[in-house]
Amino acid sequence: MFLFLVAFPFDLWIKSSFYLYLAETLARFIFVVFLLMYNHFKKLVTIPICHFNKTDLLLLPLLPILFCNFYYLLEMRNGFQITLDETFFIQIIFQISVALSEELLFRSLIQNCLSLKKTLTRIFVSSLIFALFHLTYFFSSFNLISLFVPLYTFGLGFLLGFVYEWSEKNFLYICGYHFLFNLINQVLYTYMLNVGEDYLFYVNAVCVGAFGAIYLIFLLFLSKRVNKSFQR
């Protein structure tokens, strides 16, 4: 159902960018309501909205990853231009619907319901499903560059899955992180900043990804000592 929703060709009937984003946003919010009702009646999982533990402060160094594309702009100096259009605010609301729908499905439901004992195995499998889902971008455009999307979404999915388990299934954390990542790296960067991408763009992406991977490995070593979600 979710694949149908995401791949549905709204653009065949809706030519206005504003109304296209509006239709996709409404469709995702309807899907969120459906998932919440389905979970309520089936009693699959409990979804904690927000709580805080002192160990959550160790997640703060992961925040710089949110700005990964903007580090590239620091190298460009004055080589970019900010442009706003009428779709700006609807894109923000759309990214909220993306974060809610994808985190509810892939983390709260799929990752929670996987019948796997080890926490890291559940994170890995849910991240793989999350990455394969993003192959829809390739099948909708048949652009070879879109084949790289599942690679970075696997890394993002693993990070979100780790944060989800570390924070004891804090839904607000993963939704907030996912929303800000998309807002900063897609809306503000891709849609608002007219920049070209040269080799420095990819060098920057690799460096930021390497930092995130190293810090996650560090947290993995700590996890069995300070976090009960990983003590199995």
Feature-to-residue mapping (PLM):
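Alpha-helical transmembrane segments in multi-pass membrane proteins
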Residues: 1-39, 86-90, 201-214
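Juxtamembrane "helix-exit" motif on the non-cytosolic side of transmembrane helices
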Residues: 5-15, 70-81, 134-140, 187-194
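Membrane-interface capping segments at transmembrane-helix boundaries
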Residues: 40-47, 217-232
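Hydrophobic alpha-helical transmembrane segments
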Residues: 57-61, 89, 120-125, 147-151, ...
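Small-polar-interrupted transmembrane alpha-helices in polytopic inner-membrane proteins
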Residues: 65-68, 95, 119-135, 157
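Juxtamembrane helix-entry segments on the extracytoplasmic side of multipass membrane proteins
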Residues: 80-92, 139-152, 201-202
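Membrane-interface helix/loop boundary segments of multi-pass membrane proteins
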Residues: 101-127, 162-170
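Functionally important transmembrane alpha-helices
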Residues: 148-208
